[in-house]
Amino acid sequence: MANVHVINHPLVQHKLTIIRDKNTGTKAFRELVDEVATLMAYEITRDMELEDIQVETPLQTTTAKTLTGKKLGIVPILRAGLGMQDGILKLIPAAKVGHVGLYRDHDTLEPVEYFVKLPSDVEERLFIVVDPMLATGGSAIMAIDCLKKRGARNMKFMCLVAAPEGVKALQDAHPDVEIYVAGLDEKLDENGYIRPGLGDAGDRLFGTK
């Protein structure tokens, strides 16, 4: 699929297996999601631009590389996206953080927006929109819609697991947004859940039912 990057790093895949396991408790689940987010952030930032600068080492002046180009922003989709936020910030501590609050209506399976708060300089940033799961694609599409309406022009989407239906929906709605996923799963079931999936990420992160 165009613009879809499956992160097959052995550590990502190993940790994702434990995340999927129904016997993994809240504490371990939360820690593993955080760790996988850090590892995936390493991949999603691989194409960041560099420029040469002069730096003084203890021994001499030399040419070295430093980041340039667009500043970064992280936008977790509430609430489950919060579980990936700190893992990315460990790697990119200077990134600004916005939030988009959505919940899925369990009757219509459609997302409903209830909160949006973004940095003021949205036009200048590359945003990494994060949510552990890409199921129908509705929440990701609405979150990216929210950013674009407020002036954002550069975005990537990152999730742990995705259904093919959600990937296609997001690609159709936002073909300019690259998708980074740890596990591309089989399908959505009749209830709109990813199979085999990992259960309800929000409930497993926060210990709720």
UniProtKB/Swiss-Prot annotation:
InterPro entries: PRibTrfase_dom (IPR000836), PRTase-like (IPR029057), Upp_B (IPR034332), UPRTase/APRTase (IPR050054), Ura_phspho_trans (IPR005765). Binds 1 Mg(2+) ion per subunit. The magnesium is bound as Mg-PRPP. Its cofactor is Mg(2+). Gene3D superfamilies: 3.40.50.2020. Transmembrane segments: none annotated. GO terms for molecular function: GTP binding; magnesium ion binding; uracil phosphoribosyltransferase activity. Keywords: Allosteric enzyme, Glycosyltransferase, GTP-binding, Magnesium, Nucleotide-binding, Transferase. Allosterically activated by GTP. Belongs to the UPRTase family. This is Uracil phosphoribosyltransferase. The gene is upp.
